């Protein structure tokens, strides 16, 4: 039997086993977020998808209008003027072949890695290092692009990637629990709209199954999905 800490047991007692409106759920999330650090607000969404089928896979990005509340370190691998553009846009780490070599040796002091299409053949050998950490550049994730300046600005400004895991669930942050209720609700609604907009062609039956919120150290709160419509 799973045991909970006294703190979490107390917090869980504040959440009734029912469906809450989005505003009620966010209010409870904020009220039950009392760790000694700024907790991340997270959404856990079960969709009617079976990602083992190619036409039911979902991977996309969304720009949260109120940001993530996290300072994102962005690295860029490019050459020539594209590398200059990345540096001018504020990339925290940048380079070409020399940066690839540093990453192979263990350098991973960044949260996102952006690359131009022409260097992708060189980056292929980084798959074993970057893949398990979710850092491998990908066109679907918006991290393989010629517009490196735009990509740097978007990821530093609140762009997040989401995807369904093998059980059909999306785990995505939507801010910090210290954000205002209005800002958290707006970010959530933006995520909902993005998931609808990127609905896979092979999705069958009920698309939205369950929608839970939680803070990093807080209890789960289930949303009535109709309150997001």
UniProtKB/Swiss-Prot annotation:
PROSITE patterns: RIBOSOMAL_L1. The keyword Plastid applies. Its main location: plastid. Coiled coil: none annotated. Keywords: Chloroplast, Plastid, Ribonucleoprotein, Ribosomal protein, RNA-binding, rRNA-binding. The keyword Plastid applies. One of its GO terms (biological process) is translation. Part of the 50S ribosomal subunit. Belongs to the universal ribosomal protein uL1 family. This is Large ribosomal subunit protein uL1c. It comes from Pyropia yezoensis.
